[in-house]
């Protein structure tokens, strides 16, 4: 059954998908690294790479607002590859500085497997 708000929801979803494409092209996605700590020793043993969208118009967009649309649109595969490459580049950079970040965990979509 058609409801009047369906048109506006579809239009909003399409606008967001277009903005996500622009965000990828304009390098607005960033990774934040959350430490993984050994509970017994308190030692940081690695990091988890977390995808964030730094939108120049609205600031930091919560992942719950854009990751589901990346999944639905299929863009998650392209963005997921970007995440993997970025995490590897960041890890190489840290090692070049003489740091040892440990393991970096990257969450991937089932579509990427």
Locate predicted features.
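Bacterial c-di-GMP phosphodiesterase EAL domain
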Residues: 4-113
């Amino acid at each position: 059954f058609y409801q009047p708000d369906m048109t506006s929801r579809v239009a909003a979803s399409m606008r967001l998908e277009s903005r996500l494409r622009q965000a990828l092209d304009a390098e607005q996605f960033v990774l934040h690294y959350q430490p993984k700590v050994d509970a017994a020793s308190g030692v940081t043993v690695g990091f988890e790479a977390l995808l964030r969208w730094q939108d120049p118009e609205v600031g930091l967009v919560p992942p719950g607002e854009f990751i589901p649309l990346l999944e639905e649109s299929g863009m998650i595969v392209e963005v997921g590859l970007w995440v993997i490459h970025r995490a590897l580049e960041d890890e190489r950079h840290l090692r070049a500085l003489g740091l040892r970040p440990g393991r970096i965990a990257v969450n991937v979509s089932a579509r990427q497997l």
